[in-house]
Amino acid sequence: MELTTIAEDLAFPEGPVVMADGSVIVVEIAGPRLTRVHPDGTTSVITEWDNPASAGPNGAAVGPDGHMYVCNNGGFLWSDVNGMRFPLDRASGSNQAPEYVTGSIDRVDLGTGQITTLYTECDGHRLCGPNDLVFDSTGGFWFTDLGKQRVRDLDKGAVYYARPDGSAISRCIDNIDHPNGCGLSPDGATLYVAQTTTGRVWAYDITAPGELASPRGTCIANTLGNLDSMAVEAGGAVVVAALRQGLLVVAPDQT
């Protein structure tokens, strides 16, 4: 496969969102900023977080109101090894910056660049490190919280459901290790979640907005890869980015 470079010199880009005008909006986690990549390869900054040591825009998605909703992981420690940047202090094994306070769900006005923080906690427990999100047909969204890793311990992850106006948030899946990418089946009846460290992809039956038949789910892929974000094709195939292997594709019949 021949790959074409469209834009360079981005500070750890993730969360690409294809826009109607042909541009692609990405987060630059190490920026931390939200950037538009135009079809000709030029870039323009939409907004920057004013607390770079404790902000880390991660997954992003356009909401029903046209605003961009961003998982803010609260910032990382960084290491540069052999020309590559890693969101982790390789010496200590920690990725939690000293300035870290909390993770959050942020809303960005794409016209003005204004950032509004919608959620920093759920039922009195802070969001540790939100990672990826996906909207459903009712206008609500599911999001993963991968958490933070410290020298001697790490957070247990979770999956949440929230409303885009900041009015309601609920914890739907608890104690899941490193939940990363998430997506919905074309009919909106199934939630998919990829785990980074286990290399597994899980499927959960949705019974109503923000409600699952069971928080246990069904494992539809068990790999040796370290999984990242995902996308679900119109035909139902689940495509997951694997950090070293490339792309993992789970067919609609889950083979």
Residue ranges and their predicted role:
Residues 1-255:
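Sequence-structural signature of mature extracellular/luminal beta-sheet repeat domains
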